[in-house]
UniProtKB/Swiss-Prot annotation:
<dbReference type="GO" id="GO:0043709">
    <property type="term" value="P:cell adhesion involved in single-species biofilm formation"/>
</dbReference>
<dbReference type="InterPro" id="IPR050469">
    <property type="entry name" value="Diguanylate_Cyclase"/>
</dbReference>
<dbReference type="GO" id="GO:0005886">
    <property type="term" value="C:plasma membrane"/>
</dbReference>
<feature type="transmembrane region" description="Helical">
    <location>
        <begin position="25"/>
        <end position="45"/>
    </location>
</feature>
<protein>
    <recommendedName>
        <fullName>Probable diguanylate cyclase DgcQ</fullName>
        <ecNumber>2.7.7.65</ecNumber>
    </recommendedName>
</protein>
<feature type="domain" description="GGDEF">
    <location>
        <begin position="433"/>
        <end position="568"/>
    </location>
</feature>
<keyword id="KW-0479">Metal-binding</keyword>
<dbReference type="Pfam" id="PF17151">
    <property type="entry name" value="CHASE7"/>
</dbReference>
<feature type="active site" description="Proton acceptor">
    <location>
        <position position="484"/>
    </location>
</feature>
<feature type="binding site">
    <location>
        <position position="458"/>
    </location>
    <ligand>
        <name>substrate</name>
    </ligand>
</feature>
<feature type="binding site">
    <location>
        <position position="449"/>
    </location>
    <ligand>
        <name>substrate</name>
    </ligand>
</feature>
<dbReference type="GO" id="GO:1902201">
    <property type="term" value="P:negative regulation of bacterial-type flagellum-dependent cell motility"/>
</dbReference>
<keyword id="KW-0135">Cellulose biosynthesis</keyword>
<feature type="binding site">
    <location>
        <position position="484"/>
    </location>
    <ligand>
        <name>Mg(2+)</name>
    </ligand>
</feature>
<comment type="subunit">
    <text>Homodimer.</text>
</comment>
<comment type="function">
    <text>Catalyzes the synthesis of cyclic-di-GMP (c-di-GMP) via the condensation of 2 GTP molecules. Cyclic-di-GMP is a second messenger which controls cell surface-associated traits in bacteria. Involved in the regulation of cellulose production.</text>
</comment>
<dbReference type="Pfam" id="PF00990">
    <property type="entry name" value="GGDEF"/>
</dbReference>
Length: 569
């Protein structure tokens, strides 16, 4: 309890210090300080304009980049969603294959041709895609390949079902050039037809040696998540670069194969060009996760990379800490944003010459005129505002003091005391601190008024108020709530501590005689009632005051000039 009291007293002292500081720094000083700050900042006008313009410029660059990145991301997300849909369909077909005669015949046909060097199973060329495969002997030569699974027949029928879905999902408006399912059991289904059966082994081994297939082994892809891979063409090769999104197909902890979709870089380049506002400057570049250049929106530099190794290193360092951002490189501003559904980053490059031709010159002039107008108005109005604020503050302070205080005793009046007490009670309740109330009533005050007059009574009230105030702690609050009644609020004080304060008040009032007329002195006394929230857990100020008032009258009935802190004391 001692620690709680110390903490509470420290908090009260801090609040008192803040109030003193607020009184010392009156509105007049604050107005002067504001104008001084304005004058100081006027010397930094040019710098401030640069900062404002730079923030607006960076926001503009990021917004343009975000629009293009979102458009590209949505298109890529559509392809990823299709891939997940195909995987779910494949899993369902592996667990519960359709019991069609044509599918059973396909399994029989596989058993008949599985030893052949190359084979092809086709149900209906118009509705589904053929399954192309190689022999058992060729499968046994691959480290990742195997036909040793109990659900091989189900996988054959599932591949035919997925072939039907692949044909439906593949369309010319999509960026995807090829969608394929490659099985570890030596066969594949692809939207790109294999015209000659003799080409099946070459094409199959081309698939299973690709990073997008090998990278989905259970060791390489433990989380069995979607992955993106980039393939760069070799020198003297006619193939074009492309990115492949792929996902493993597993069932019952067995890896069956990989579903993949290949997107040529040229289609992504065309998409970037179509997504960009023709009225905007700047070049967009797409990079993979290793910051290898893929494509650009600039038709004049379709395969160029405008960053040297040092700049790429700076860009990579900046990307380590956030998913989006910007960096200034010489006369260029480079903004970047990682894509959600592609393992790569979209970069926007804006040069200084492009920025000069933009709208920021007009913005600079507008900001300058606005600042000049605002400063002129401040300087012209300063004197009038300063005088008005000073006069209003003096008047407000006087009216506020009169509204909150009793002019005779200079203590809080009843309304102000209640306004102060309720928030303090709520604060003590919140922090589980005790909250106590002392009710004070001067004994035989009416007799003093009747015998010595109202002026003497006023002097007694003023004298008693001074003694009560001098008996309190710094955080305590006292107020006059009636004719000769006073109320003291003690936040953080328990019943015992409040009773000690009440006894101190009683002794001070009773031990000093006061002069009320020429050669006439009297000794006054008071009856006091004490209540505390720790008795019943009730922090309602009015209830506590009522309880203290009841105990006050118990003290009067017991003979006056005493303190009652309980109903039995």
């Amino acid at each position: 309890m001692g620690v709680v009291r110390v903490q509470h007293e420290t908090k009260m002292e801090n609040q008192s210090w803040l109030k003193k500081l607020a009184r010392r720094l009156g509105p007049g000083h604050i107005v002067n300080l504001c104008f001084i700050v304005v004058l100081l900042f006027s010397t930094l006008l040019t710098w401030r304009e640069v900062v404002v313009l730079e923030d607006a410029y960076i926001s503009s660059q990021r917004n343009h980049l975000e629009n293009v990145a979102n458009a590209l991301d949505k298109h890529l997300q559509y392809n990823v969603d299709k891939l997940i849909f195909l995987r779910n369909g494949m899993r369902e077909a592996l667990v519960a294959p359709l019991d069609f005669t044509s599918l059973r015949n396909a399994v029989t046909e596989f058993e008949q041709h599985r030893d052949e060097h190359a084979w092809q199973i086709e149900l209906n060329r118009r509705r589904t895609l053929p399954v192309n495969g190689v022999s058992d002997a060729l499968v046994s030569e691959g480290n990742l390949l195997s036909r040793e699974n109990e659900s091989l027949d189900n996988e054959i029928t599932a591949a035919l079902e997925v072939g039907y879905l692949l044909r439906l999902a593949h369309n010319s408006s999509s960026m995807v050039e090829q969608a394929v399912y490659v099985s570890r059991a030596g066969f594949y289904v692809s939207t790109l037809p294999t015209l000659f059966t003799r080409n099946v082994p070459t094409r199959y081994y081309g698939y299973v040696t690709q990073p997008w297939f090998i990278g989905h082994s259970q060791r390489e892809n433990r989380h069995r998540a979607v992955r993106w891979f980039t393939s760069q063409p070799e020198h003297a090769s006619n193939t074009e670069p492309q990115v492949t999104v792929s996902v493993p197909v597993d069932s019952n902890n067995y890896w069956y194969g990989v579903l993949g979709m290949s997107i040529p870089v040229r289609t992504m380049q065309q998409f970037l060009r179509n997504a960009i506002d023709k009225n905007l400057d700047g070049e967009y570049q797409l990079y993979d996760s290793k910051l290898r250049f893929l494509t650009s929106s600039n038709p004049d530099h379709p395969t160029g990379n405008i960053f040297d190794p040092r700049e790429l290193a700076l860009l990579a360092q900046a990307m380590e800490h956030d998913t989006r951002g910007g960096i200034r490189m010489d006369s260029r501003y480079v903004s970047w944003e990682r894509l959600d559904h592609f393992d790569g980053v979209l970069v926007r490059v804006h040069t200084l010459s492009e920025g000069v031709r933009g709208d920021f010159g007009s913005i600079s002039i507008a900001l300058t005129l606005l600042w000049a107008l605002f400063t002129s108005m401040l300087l012209l109005s300063w004197y009038v505002i300063r005088r008005m604020v000073s006069n209003m503050y003096v008047l407000q302070s006087s009216l506020q003091w009169q509204a909150w205080h009793d002019t005779l005793t200079r203590l809080y009046n009843r309304g102000a005391l209640f306004e102060k007490a309720c928030p303090l009670a709520k604060l003590c309740h919140t922090h589980q601190h005790p909250f106590s109330v002392i009710q004070v009533d001067l004994d035989h005050f009416k007799a003093i008024n009747d015998r010595f007059g109202h002026q003497a009574g006023d002097r007694v009230l003023s004298h008693a108020a001074g003694l009560i105030s001098s008996s309190l702690r710094a955080q305590d609050i006292a107020g006059r709530v009636g004719g000769e009644e006073f109320c003291v609020i003690l936040p953080g004080a328990n019943l015992t501590q409040a009773a000690e304060v009440a006894e101190r008040i009683r002794l001070k009032l009773n031990e000093k005689e006061m002069l009320i007329a020429k050669s006439t002195t009297i000794r006054i006394s008071a009856s006091l009632g004490v209540s505390s929230s720790e008795e019943t857990g009730d922090y309602d100020f009015e209830q506590l005051q009522s309880l203290a008032d009841r105990r006050l009258y118990l003290a009067k009935q017991a003979g006056r000039n005493r303190v009652f802190a309980s109903d039995n004391a």
